[in-house]
Each structure stands twice: as structure tokens, then as C-alpha cells.
């Protein structure tokens, strides 16, 4: 059942919305040549729009809830181990990407850029070169 759910929630739409699959070693090698400043610019100008478009395409609307669902689907389909802990109104994430500090910064930047549009934000963030953890709360 879970494999079928994953397929319908992300893989089914990935090609339609312009996402491609890359191996971790390839992505890690590319990211090692990208500055944090450049990655932040890319995250806000390009990737923010792509994630918003993906969410609208998959769920028909962009809300905090549909964005969080598409984030979960994207992480799962990308085989990036993560935990999403729902605690009342707070969503807590622990993401073990193993793709370097630049990717940690990328994740937090793109997620925060979208959340800010809804008066939500990331806080209590901890970034390492292997993982990122944060909470999502209303501002």
C-alpha cells in the first residue's frame, strides 16, 4: 500500500512538473562547487517556484498543508530519510540527507521562503553537513 501511495503522490507527477532524479554522489559533487550564497539565490528564485508549482499541480491548491504533504512526498520519492513529527500545531522535521552543508542551507531556505508566504516559518533549526532539523510554526 505504501509503495502505491508514494507512486501516486510524487513519482506520477515528477516528470510532468520538470523534476529529475539524480544520484546522491552526483549531487554531492555538484554541490561541493556551489557557494552558500549562490545556493540561497537559486533556492529563492528557481526552486521556490518549482516546489509551489509542484504542490499546485499535485493537490490543486497551495496551502501550508498541501505544501507540507508535497514536501513529505518529495523527500520520500528522493529516498532522503526523514521523520515528520506532528505535535499539536507544530510540525517537526529531522532530515538525514548526507549531501553537505550547502544542501542543508538549500532545504531550510526554500522551505522557509514558501512558508513565509503563509505567515509560517522555520525555527529551532539545526544544520549539519549530514542533516537538518527544524520546526514549522505560525509566525
Where are these regions (language model features)?
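Beta-rich nucleic-acid/ligand-interaction surfaces
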Residues: 127-139
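N-terminal accessory segment detector
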Residues: 1-86
Amino acid at each position: 500500500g505504501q509503495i502505491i501511495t508514494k507512486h501516486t503522490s510524487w513519482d506520477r507527477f515528477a516528470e510532468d512538473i520538470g523534476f529529475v532524479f539524480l544520484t546522491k554522489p552526483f549531487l554531492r559533487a555538484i554541490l561541493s562547487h556551489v557557494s552558500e550564497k549562490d545556493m540561497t539565490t537559486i533556492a529563492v528564485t528557481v526552486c521556490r517556484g518549482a516546489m509551489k508549482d509542484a504542490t499546485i499541480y499535485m493537490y490543486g491548491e497551495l496551502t501550508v498543508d498541501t505544501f507540507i504533504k508535497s514536501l513529505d512526498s518529495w523527500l520520500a520519492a528522493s529516498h532522503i530519510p526523514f521523520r515528520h513529527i506532528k505535535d499539536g500545531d507544530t510540525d517537526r522535521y529531522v532530515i538525514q540527507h548526507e549531501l553537505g552543508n550547502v544542501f542543508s542551507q538549500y532545504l531550510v531556505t526554500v522551505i522557509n521562503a514558501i512558508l513565509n508566504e503563509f505567515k509560517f516559518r522555520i525555527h529551532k533549526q539545526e544544520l549539519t553537513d549530514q542533516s537538518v532539523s527544524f520546526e514549522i510554526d505560525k509566525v
